[in-house]
């Protein structure tokens, strides 16, 4: 395991005794994480879960004027376009308004340890290309609520792709503490990659969190979570996990009440990247703790990378074939023997990246 060095201003992961005077702030990030496949087939994903996601969130966007929804995975947007074109066109209006937010930057929410650097960059490139062509926007973050560990190269790759932040909730699934007494280095800070480039890191907590029609500005748990950092800020997922859909009506109403409330917590109905943008440029915020290392899971993550070895073998063989095809195509064009088959290569990579999904390549799906 790579050595991990934690560099914190104040010297403690949570800096409990170094809270700032400012009011606690909660970035409420609505999501409906949808597995491309897991305990069901892709046909079920498209017929039930993709439909539920777009239909339910269009309803919430119409009903609640402050509701902001975040959703990741270019392949799921492509399925929306193919199978639910009327709803897709309606969704585009809310994307233009900034209320349906494109998160994650990628073609799919792939595993974050097995794929090569080339695969990572292709995944981001193809995702961003789709978002530009379809919606006229680009994503700015890595949004992986449900992956099983994150390599030290991830912040370097993200930074070189022009991205500014990363979030997940999965490290809470660790069985044993890893960073002192904690399962993660801190809840909000900077993550430094192997070349020294940094992105912002935010721990999102449980993505299936729900509330029952309360004023979240008065919520004691949000206040306590915000107090775990010297920033007095919490980044909080809420919604559903794995099967898509949407947050509950009561949860959305709780955020709406919090926005109007006068309690000790300032509520923000946030896009997945708003926190990162609020702290740019990062060099102006020396109070941000810095982590320099990898973010791994123990029991759960270990099984993902020691089983279904054949799938990992086929993955690597396809990465090598993709590299060979790219070299051959570029050489042929350079020699004026053939036109570079960009569309063919991109479509092949999309089909391949689809199988690098974090429950596919790891062997954790049926």
Identify what each model region corresponds to.
Residues 1-9:
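Bacterial N-terminal signal peptides
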């Amino acid at each position: 395991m790579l050595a991990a060095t934690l560099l914190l201003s104040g010297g403690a992961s949570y800096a409990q005794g170094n809270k700032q005077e400012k009011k606690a702030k909660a970035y409420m990030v609505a999501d409906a994480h949808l597995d491309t496949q897991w305990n069901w087939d892709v046909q079920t994903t498209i017929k039930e879960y993709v439909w539920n996601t777009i239909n339910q969130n269009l309803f919430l966007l119409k009903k609640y004027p402050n509701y902001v929804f975040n959703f990741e995975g270019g392949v799921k947007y492509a399925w929306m376009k193919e199978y639910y074109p009327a709803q897709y066109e309606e969704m585009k209006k809310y994307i233009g308004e900034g209320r349906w937010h494109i998160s994650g930057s990628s073609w799919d929410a792939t595993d974050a340890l097995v794929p090569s650097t080339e695969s990572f960059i292709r995944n981001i490139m193809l995702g961003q290309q789709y978002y530009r062509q379809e919606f006229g926007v680009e994503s700015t973050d890595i949004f992986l609520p449900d992956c099983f560990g994150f390599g030290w190269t991830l912040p370097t790759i993200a930074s070189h792709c022009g991205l500014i932040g990363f979030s997940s909730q999965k490290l809470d699934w660790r069985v044993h503490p890893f960073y002192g007494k904690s399962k993660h280095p801190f809840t909000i800070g900077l993550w430094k990659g192997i070349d020294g480039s940094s992105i912002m890191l935010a721990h999102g907590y449980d993505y299936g969190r729900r509330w029952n029609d309360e004023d979240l500005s008065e919520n004691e748990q949000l206040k306590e979570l915000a107090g775990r950092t010297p920033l007095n800020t919490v980044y909080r997922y809420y919604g559903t996990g794995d099967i898509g859909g949407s947050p509950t009506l009561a949860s959305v109403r709780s955020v709406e009440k919090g926005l109007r409330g006068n309690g000790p917590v300032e509520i923000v109905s946030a896009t997945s990247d708003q926190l990162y943008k609020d702290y740019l440029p990062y060099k102006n915020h020396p109070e941000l703790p810095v982590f320099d290392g990898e973010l791994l899971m123990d029991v759960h993550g270990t099984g993902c990378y020691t089983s279904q070895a054949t799938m990992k073998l086929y993955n690597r063989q396809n990465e090598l074939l993709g590299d060979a095809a790219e070299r051959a195509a570029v050489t042929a064009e350079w020699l004026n023997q053939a036109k570079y088959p960009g569309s063919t290569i991109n479509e092949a990579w999309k089909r391949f990246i689809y199988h690098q999904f974090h429950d596919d390549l790891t062997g954790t799906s049926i």
